[in-house]
Regions:
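Substrate-binding pocket helix/loop in short-chain dehydrogenase/reductase
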Residues: 91-92, 99-104
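Conserved glycine-rich cofactor-binding loop
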Residues: 15-16
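Alpha-helical segment proximal to the catalytic Tyr-Lys
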Residues: 120, 159, 163-167
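Active-site helix of classical SDR
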Residues: 115, 150
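Conserved glycine-rich Rossmann-like NAD(P)H-binding loop of the short-chain dehydrogenase/reductase
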Residues: 29-45
């Protein structure tokens, strides 16, 4: 299912993990991929001719919007993947106000701003907004209250946005991954189990994105939950 190369896909949090895997998948599918990340030096980033890493902190709204204007001036944007995320774990009273603000801005505010900046273009191109949420959006999340709340807010935004924009051909999809082998949990006191069946890989989420894009025009799956076969986590 190869797309015309000039169609653009924008992916946040693209320097590693899920965002990196999605960027590589979209590159193979023929999109002109613009991946936003804070540090591509530490990542095993493999840039093809149609993959463009952009060093930018998504919390720098002015810089982010400037890049978006430059991209949309040269390419029809077909896909936006809001993937950048950050998690802080522990008792809620032990989170600082600054950490709570950063978490909400990264996981919820920035996706809403990026979508606002690109929505007119996505309507014109009958494009996709793919939001990477979390299974914690749909369940109790003790020791991760703020993270779960922000991801639940992202899911709510997705559902309302789809109802608002569907008549223009815009597809809005939320992916809810369970524990995935990424750096997201580096601040947590737990990690995935040792068995390969106890966690997801970033490539699993990228595969879900490919499946979303493979559906015929007129069909949209709005929510996808990905879970490992075995539920097992380990304390660090």
């Amino acid at each position: 299912m190869e797309r015309v190369k000039k169609e653009a896909a924008i992916v946040t949090g693209a320097s590693s993990g899920i965002g990196y895997a999605i960027s590589q998948k979209l590159s193979v599918l023929g999109y002109e991929v613009f991946g936003f990340g804070r540090d591509f030096e530490k990542a095993a980033w493999q840039a093809a001719d149609n993959v463009h890493p952009i060093v930018c902190d998504v919390l720098d709204t002015n810089k982010l919007c400037t890049y978006i204007k430059q991209i949309t001036a040269q390419h029809p944007v077909h896909i936006l993947v809001n993937n950048a995320g950050i998690g802080y774990y522990g008792l809620h009273e032990e989170l600082s106000p600054d950490k709570i603000k950063k978490l909400v801005r990264t996981n919820l505010e920035t996706p809403m701003i990026l979508t606002q900046q690109l929505l007119r273009h996505l309507k014109k191109n009958a494009g996709y907004v793919i939001n990477i949420s979390s299974v914690t959006a749909n369940q109790s999340n003790p020791h991760g209250c703020a993270y779960g709340a922000a991801k639940a807010g992202l899911a709510s935004f997705s559902h309302s946005l789809f109802d608002e924009a569907r008549k223009y051909g815009v597809k809005v999809v939320t992916i809810f991954p369970d524990i995935t082998q990424t750096n997201l949990y580096r601040n947590a006191d737990f990690r995935e189990g040792d068995e390969a069946e106890s966690y997801l890989l970033p490539e699993d989420v990228a595969g879900a994105v490919e499946w979303i894009l493979s559906q015929r025009e007129g069909v949209i799956v709005t929510d996808i939950t990905l879970k490992p076969q075995i539920h097992r986590i380990k304390r660090k």
